[in-house]
Amino acid sequence: TPGTGLLASLDEAITSAAQLGYPVMLKSTAGGGGIGLTRCDDEAGLVEAFDTVKRLGQNFFSDSGVFLERFVDNARHVEVQIFGDGLGNVLALGERDCSLQRRNQKVVEETPAPDLPAATREKLMAASVELGKAVNYRSAGTGEYIYDAHRDVFYFLEVNTRLQVEHPITEACTSIDLVEWMILTAAGQPPALDIEINPQGAAIEVRLYAEDPVRDFQPSP
């Protein structure tokens, strides 16, 4: 998400936060484990937290540097399935919404992503194809993004360079066998990617988790 470099003073932090728009996250540049990480909903909250976060960074990590990032309320996790042949051709096969999560793990995945504007969907596809082409991507991969529905903008998270558990819902709506494509590509016979993708219908995948209620719902085999 949009953010700043290291902040030299509280005044600079206040000016930068106003430009980013509240809420913002004040972060210690050397932080870890949530130490030196504070949400600020307004200028008063930023003023109150600034010296504390700097002090935590210095005490725990010998580095008092801090910076700001925009905080996205009710952020959605949207990802795009791509496939590249390693020859410069990349195809986007639609998006998946993976926003319903528990313990930072995806629980419900669905395609198409609900309430995603058509223009935003097109931008997501184009950005993912451009990303794949930039690295001459080969095989299946997933571009992952944070989507801010309030501002109707998305921010890049990462690329998962493998076939993900939720890939069958994309297969169900495109009638494309991604595993077959991966095998063909590995065998030196990549599929033609100059095709038009028009996903049909909708699909949902749900993961089942076993948890132990006696042990604070820790994962249980």
Region spans (language model):
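A conserved helix-loop-beta module that forms one wall/lid of the active-site cleft
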Residues: T1-T29, G36
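ATP-dependent carboxylate activation and anion-phosphoryl transfer catalytic cores
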Residues: S28, G33, D41-P221
